[in-house]
Each structure stands twice: as C-alpha cells, then as structure tokens.
C-alpha cells in the first residue's frame, strides 16, 4: 500500500501549527508558535497577523525536520473551522497558495475532530467518549451512527475562556489556567454556583461569582481553588452522563485545558469508577497543533478524496456533528455492570430492593471520588431532596412517575416502585415520539424542568410512558430552561441515524406544540436560538 505524506496547517485561534504525518500514523515533523498578548484576550486581527508571520517560517522548518522535500508531499490539509474568522482566512489562504504552487491536492478539516483523531492515534483508543476542553471549545463528543456527536457542550463560554477571563480580570495574566492551578493548591473551598443543565454546562455565572468573591476580599487562593474544582466537576459530571448513556468503555481527554493535572486526575478517577479506560495523548498533542490537522486530512482524503479549490472556504461555525465520519470503528466493547446493580447511572447506583412485599428499586446517590466533599455532599443532598418532591409534584399533570416509598437524606437515597417495562431507547417510534412531546408539555405546564430527559430516563409500561430520574430537575418558568430540556432529548436521540432522529424530534415538537398552550411557539423559537449561538467562535 502506498504511504502518503500530508502537511497540515493549524491556526484557529492563538496557536500557529504546522505538522507533517504519513498515512501509517508516523509523525514526521511538528512545529508551532503561540501568541501571548501583552494585555487582554486574543484579538482576531492580532491572531491573524501572528499566523501570517509564522506560517511561512514554520513550513520550511517542518520540511527540514521531516527530512523530506516539498515534492515528497502528497496532500495539504488545513483547519477549515471552527475558529476566529480572520485567523481561519490566513490559514486557508496559506494552504491554498501552497497546494497550488506545488500542484498538490488540498483538504479542509474540522478542528475539533482533529483533536479526537490525533488523540486516538496516540493513545490507541478505538471509540471513546471524549472531553475536549480548551480556550474556545468545551464539548463532550462521541461517535454514533456515522458521525461524531456532541453529547454535551457549553451554553455560553468555554471552560478555558472562563479561566483565562478570570486570570485577566484579576491580574493573574493570560493564559489564566496555569496560574490558577498553582494558586489553587494553597486554597480552600468557598461556595460558587454549580450549573449543569441536562448534558450541558454553563460557566458565565460561575465566572461572575468568582470575580465577586475576589472583589469582596476573599483570598485569591481560595477563589482559584473553588473556581477550578467547580468548573472541572461540571465538566466531568457531563462526561460521566455521556459515558453512562452510551455505555462506551473508553474516556479520553484532549484540548489545551488538559494540561491541568487536577482535571486529568478527576477524569481518570471517574473513568475508573465506571470500569472504563482513561486515555490522554501526550501533552504536545493536546493543544492546537498541525499534526492533528495533517492526520485528519489523511483520514478524510482516504475516505472522500480531496476538495475542489472552490470548496476550501472557511467555516467559522463548523460544528463537530456536521461531518460524516464513516471511518470510525464502532466496536462492541461496552461497560460491564457490577453483579449487584440493576443499572449504574451518572450519579446513582440502582439496586434491586423491596417494600412491603412489592418489588422496589433503591436509587443511591453514591459519593463521587472525583469531587471534593464540599461540592459532592451539597449536590447529592439537594438533588435527592428535590427529586423526591418533583416525583410527586409532576403527578399532578397526569404524567406517570414511579411511586415513592421512602427518602433517606442522610444516605442520599430514594426507595421507589420498580417499573417493569422496556427502556424507551429500545422501542421508540414515530407514535411514541409524539406521545413524549405531549407528556413533556404537561410537565412544563407545571413549570417543572426534568433536567435530564433522555431515552434512558423513560420507560414504556403497558403502552404508557413512565418518566424516571428527576435528579437534575427544578422549578422554572423560563422559556430557555424548557427549551434546554427539549434539547437534552434531541441530543439523546443521536445514537439513531440522523434522518430518523430528526424525524422523531419533529414528532416530539408536534406533540409538545399541540399540548403545551399559548407560549409553545416562544419555546420552540428559543430552541432554534440556543442551537444558533456561536459556541465555537472563541
């Protein structure tokens, strides 16, 4: 088989990278330069100037390091998006110029998928749940039905952006992450908001609260410790939810924030608690680099061939789930459930039990070793208490939930009716999707948010839907919260092929609209608004 050599150019934000890789996965060269702003964050124009200066210098450097000539190149690959518009344009222009001058084929690739694929190359992971976290991106990604799917993402700013912003505002400098990590080792916990909405996280409120603590005079070490622990606990929890939903047996960490040893430790502990393998590429491959662009270019060229030069424009908001990825090996290796459990969710063990001679299940919110005790105890107690209340409150709408037998706040557990039926993800069809929409509308009409509506948290018993697991539930009349609730369900449908999943969600919205009432259109519009937000443009 002929071995091809690809040169990749990266420049979505502040890091310029050029890498050379062959189709056997050998890294032949890796060169890069990072922009360090004198003050403030990364300005798109300054980033573009940085790339314009360094790309012409790094290309010959990489060629020399690889010990090859320009004629030996078989393909030019570049990061097509997502990223800063001016920066992406410099990268694309440089790649086109090089490809045309050498008469070589060209291909543009998705930056986020580049991180995942180079991570798999380096670690040997086959089909992991990946936490990709950087200055501009925070996503939980896993491959399902021919594409990389985003199971969780930020609803506002990225985790790395949160840390960098805090660093700038408090005079710690940019990037903020390394300084925050150092100061956090000397700090103690102060209470900060913990915001997980279904499979998504939000960092803007956490950032604002942390800055307020600094202005109040709280020791900077304490704020750094609390900011880091809270932000990373949110990231790991959502990754854990995706792992529980997909039942994959590999967890991978990548992106610039993976330089933080505490985040690596937390994710590794979580993976081990589920019996999953933890993977992380070597540090030089975690941040933005040209190697990942070259490697993904080779993969996509092998699958689809090169791009026509007219199709090499940038895609500033290039979503991970827009790319067909049929090359991924969806192996049959999954998590193995311990013998004593009926199920193991993201935050609870489900144990077979009984109550007055009736079949029952005990939902036990077990301590999470990756979280500090202050955060862990607070979350487990508040969620247990609220879930018990919501299980009862939601019945007023006519929605079926398990009968509640006992609540033990000290041990953070709930004893409830055992539901004999089938998980919805095993039996969903058009008609059931419509019924789901009707039932969700009933719940929302009471201003109750389920918080984690997935096909794993609904069952079909005797032809009727039963809603489970209100652990992330709360009361809210906000259209945004109701829209996010529906989007959680949409993401959980991603294990089905795109066309069918889209059809099912349309049926859900049809049932929802017919049942909800006068504000249904505002909620459905809010769904579109949330989906259109620029979460990948730094």
UniProtKB/Swiss-Prot annotation:
<keyword id="KW-0723">Serine/threonine-protein kinase</keyword>
<dbReference type="GO" id="GO:0008270">
    <property type="term" value="F:zinc ion binding"/>
</dbReference>
<dbReference type="GO" id="GO:0005506">
    <property type="term" value="F:iron ion binding"/>
</dbReference>
<dbReference type="GO" id="GO:0005524">
    <property type="term" value="F:ATP binding"/>
</dbReference>
<keyword id="KW-0511">Multifunctional enzyme</keyword>
<dbReference type="Pfam" id="PF00814">
    <property type="entry name" value="TsaD"/>
</dbReference>
<comment type="similarity">
    <text>In the N-terminal section; belongs to the KAE1 / TsaD family.</text>
</comment>
<feature type="binding site">
    <location>
        <position position="177"/>
    </location>
    <ligand>
        <name>L-threonylcarbamoyladenylate</name>
    </ligand>
</feature>
<keyword id="KW-0067">ATP-binding</keyword>
<feature type="binding site">
    <location>
        <position position="111"/>
    </location>
    <ligand>
        <name>Fe cation</name>
    </ligand>
</feature>
<dbReference type="InterPro" id="IPR011009">
    <property type="entry name" value="Kinase-like_dom_sf"/>
</dbReference>
<dbReference type="InterPro" id="IPR043129">
    <property type="entry name" value="ATPase_NBD"/>
</dbReference>
<dbReference type="GO" id="GO:0061711">
    <property type="term" value="F:N(6)-L-threonylcarbamoyladenine synthase activity"/>
</dbReference>
<keyword id="KW-0408">Iron</keyword>
<dbReference type="GO" id="GO:0004222">
    <property type="term" value="F:metalloendopeptidase activity"/>
</dbReference>
<dbReference type="InterPro" id="IPR034680">
    <property type="entry name" value="Kae1_archaea_euk"/>
</dbReference>
<keyword id="KW-0547">Nucleotide-binding</keyword>
<feature type="binding site">
    <location>
        <position position="115"/>
    </location>
    <ligand>
        <name>Fe cation</name>
    </ligand>
</feature>
<dbReference type="InterPro" id="IPR009220">
    <property type="entry name" value="tRNA_threonyl_synthase/kinase"/>
</dbReference>
<keyword id="KW-0012">Acyltransferase</keyword>
<comment type="function">
    <text>Required for the formation of a threonylcarbamoyl group on adenosine at position 37 (t(6)A37) in tRNAs that read codons beginning with adenine. Is a component of the KEOPS complex that is probably involved in the transfer of the threonylcarbamoyl moiety of threonylcarbamoyl-AMP (TC-AMP) to the N6 group of A37. The Kae1 domain likely plays a direct catalytic role in this reaction. The Bud32 domain probably displays kinase activity that regulates Kae1 function.</text>
</comment>
<dbReference type="GO" id="GO:0004674">
    <property type="term" value="F:protein serine/threonine kinase activity"/>
</dbReference>
<dbReference type="GO" id="GO:0005737">
    <property type="term" value="C:cytoplasm"/>
</dbReference>
<dbReference type="InterPro" id="IPR017860">
    <property type="entry name" value="Peptidase_M22_CS"/>
</dbReference>
<keyword id="KW-0418">Kinase</keyword>
<keyword id="KW-0808">Transferase</keyword>
<comment type="subunit">
    <text>Component of the KEOPS complex that consists of Kae1, Bud32, Cgi121 and Pcc1; the whole complex dimerizes.</text>
</comment>
<dbReference type="GO" id="GO:0002949">
    <property type="term" value="P:tRNA threonylcarbamoyladenosine modification"/>
</dbReference>
<feature type="binding site">
    <location>
        <position position="260"/>
    </location>
    <ligand>
        <name>L-threonylcarbamoyladenylate</name>
    </ligand>
</feature>
<feature type="binding site">
    <location>
        <position position="181"/>
    </location>
    <ligand>
        <name>L-threonylcarbamoyladenylate</name>
    </ligand>
</feature>
<dbReference type="GO" id="GO:0106310">
    <property type="term" value="F:protein serine kinase activity"/>
</dbReference>
<dbReference type="InterPro" id="IPR017861">
    <property type="entry name" value="KAE1/TsaD"/>
</dbReference>
<comment type="similarity">
    <text>In the C-terminal section; belongs to the protein kinase superfamily. Tyr protein kinase family. BUD32 subfamily.</text>
</comment>
<feature type="binding site">
    <location>
        <position position="164"/>
    </location>
    <ligand>
        <name>L-threonylcarbamoyladenylate</name>
    </ligand>
</feature>
<keyword id="KW-0479">Metal-binding</keyword>
<feature type="region of interest" description="Kae1">
    <location>
        <begin position="1"/>
        <end position="327"/>
    </location>
</feature>
<dbReference type="InterPro" id="IPR022495">
    <property type="entry name" value="Bud32"/>
</dbReference>
<dbReference type="GO" id="GO:0004712">
    <property type="term" value="F:protein serine/threonine/tyrosine kinase activity"/>
</dbReference>
<feature type="domain" description="Protein kinase">
    <location>
        <begin position="336"/>
        <end position="538"/>
    </location>
</feature>
<feature type="binding site">
    <location>
        <position position="363"/>
    </location>
    <ligand>
        <name>ATP</name>
    </ligand>
</feature>
<dbReference type="InterPro" id="IPR000905">
    <property type="entry name" value="Gcp-like_dom"/>
</dbReference>
<dbReference type="InterPro" id="IPR008266">
    <property type="entry name" value="Tyr_kinase_AS"/>
</dbReference>
